[in-house]
A protein has these predicted regions:
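Extracellular/luminal recognition modules and glycoprotein regions
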Residues: 27, 32-53, 57
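Forkhead-associated
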Residues: 47-94, 225
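Broad, structure-driven detector of short, well-ordered beta-strand segments within folded domains
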Residues: 59-67, 108-114, 188-192
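Phosphate/adenylate-binding glycine loop and adjacent helical scaffold
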Residues: 78, 84-111, 117, 132
Length: 274
């Protein structure tokens, strides 16, 4: 390295991170490492049609009942919904329902979920090994040169693209349009899912593998309602949930969202104590 080549430390000193970014980073660490955060996920039990079944490590019997999960238990099982032990049959609304149901058992949080019409029960355990070994999220120093103003080009008709998920299965990913930005006179496009003024992107770049997890996620928003101005701040690129637990089923980037660009900003990987 030459005497004039900047190191990560000198770059960080030259471009101190805004307080809001530091606060965001602290909140991210706290969120994933919470007692029932992403690091605590120890199982996802998929449910098939048919008779109620026992799930590994859990009391009670579990089944599919239409678009809800049916739980059969007795008070001695100590499966609590809103602080009250389930006694008999209780129907549980999954995570995407307007009022999802959460079950607690011996400190663990049990969350019914639904993906493409298939129901499952997720188990979050505060004693998970991933929580015990967590050493913080590794991040690049803040880089103001990786903050872009983008324009949104909606598709004439939004579509669902079949993409590989972290568990090896393909599932549909709804895409509504492209976020378009430029760097060094090169135009880049990222297919995004739009919800109101928010745009969610799953992307890859040339740092994946050597320096970062296999892909990352980014949320962008319209700066001012009605302006159409969108800020893509790659300093807030974050690891997908499956970087913290193998039991998440995150979609990988859709075709076209692998950038021929080194995005040396944002989260890199999960830190682990030796």
């Amino acid at each position: 390295m030459s005497e004039t080549e900047p190191t990560a430390t000198t770059r960080a000193a030259a471009h101190p991170a805004p307080p809001a970014w530091n606060q965001w980073a602290e909140k991210r660490d706290a969120s994933v490492s919470g007692s029932h955060g992403a690091l605590a996920l120890v199982a996802t039990h998929w449910l098939g049609e048919g008779a109620a079944v026992a799930l590994d490590g859990l009391p009670g019997r579990w089944a599919v009942d239409g678009d809800r999960v049916s739980l059969t238990a007795e008070p001695a099982d100590a499966l609590l919904v809103e602080g009250v032990a389930v006694d008999g049959v209780r129907l549980l609304d999954p995570d995407l329902a307007p009022d999802p149901t959460v079950v607690f058992h011996d400190g663990r949080k049990l969350v019914p979920i639904v993906r493409e019409g298939v129901l499952a029960v997720r188990v979050y355990d505060p004693e998970a090994e991933n929580r015990r070994t967590f050493a913080g999220i590794e991040r690049f120093p803040y880089e103001p040169g990786l903050v872009f103003t983008a324009r949104y080009e909606p598709y004439v008709h939004g579509h669902v693209e079949q993409v590989l998920n972290a568990d090896g299965r393909e599932r549909g990913l709804a895409l509504d349009g492209d976020l378009v930005f430029g760097r060094d006179e090169v135009e880049y496009r990222l297919a995004a899912t739009r919800t109101g003024d928010r745009f969610d992107v799953t992307f890859g770049d040339t740092t994946n593998g050597p320096d970062t997890f296999g892909f990352r996620q980014l949320a962008a928003a319209i700066v001012r309602p009605g302006s159409g101005e969108i800020v893509l701040d790659f300093n807030r690129a974050q690891l997908p949930p499956c970087a913290f637990s193998d039991h998440f089923i995150c979609p990988v980037p859709p075709v076209g969202n692998r950038l021929d660009l080194a995005v040396t900003a944002g989260e890199k990987r999960r830190g682990v104590h030796a």
